[in-house]
Regions:
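Short catalytic-loop micro-motif centered on adjacent basic/acidic residues
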Residues: 172
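Accessory nucleic acid-recognition modules appended to NTPase machines
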Residues: 2-169
């Protein structure tokens, strides 16, 4: 199935099947477009909502957007990256907002209706999609090693895009 057809299936059918709640396909498209514009960032639900509202004729609530995002998570379309915290008792102020990502960058490309020439002519956007591709692959490798991938950003803006941590379990 081509990614454009997959995108249509998500918007028209799959999102409502996630939890049996009927959802508006046009609203889903606008949400997925906004999410694609914010991938790789720690955009809050109100930020995404404000982005959607520029093209929305009716008011949406934070709860509605959260419900749509939850459904997209359930059907494995999006997977946010949690923040890494070095130590629970650390005095260092760490930003703990999740970073927004599609599980596959091609879904974001389809949501924005982009093609190869669009990406070649906008290298900043291309870079965000490449980052999403790296996140996807790192998650696959981390999972095989029983690890997880995180992002890190402190109060001064120092950041590490990807941080791998292997889970270690102590046995008696």
């Amino acid at each position: 199935m081509q990614v454009k057809e997959y995108f249509k299936a998500i918007c028209n059918n799959d999102i409502s099947r996630a939890d049996g709640v009927s959802r508006n396909s046009d609203r889903t498209k606008r949400l997925m477009r906004s999410y694609a514009r914010h991938q790789g960032s720690q955009a809050s639900i109100p930020t995404i909502l404000a982005d959607i509202a520029t093209n929305e004729t009716e008011d949406l609530s934070d709860e509605t957007v959260a419900s749509y995002l939850s459904a997209l998570r359930k059907i494995f379309v999006i997977e946010d990256m949690p923040a890494w915290n070095p130590n629970l008792r650390s005095k260092t102020a760490i930003r703990t907002s999740d970073t927004r990502y599609y599980v596959d960058p091609s879904i974001a490309v389809a949501a924005l209706g982009l093609g190869p020439n669009d990406l070649i002519n906008d290298l900043n956007t291309f870079g965000l999609f490449f980052e999403t591709l790296c996140v996807r692959d790192l998650r696959v490798y981390a999972d095989a090693l029983d690890g997880a991938v995180y992002h890190y950003r402190d109060k001064n803006g120092k950041k590490q895009a990807f941080f791998f941590e292997k889970r270690v379990f102590l046995q008696k």
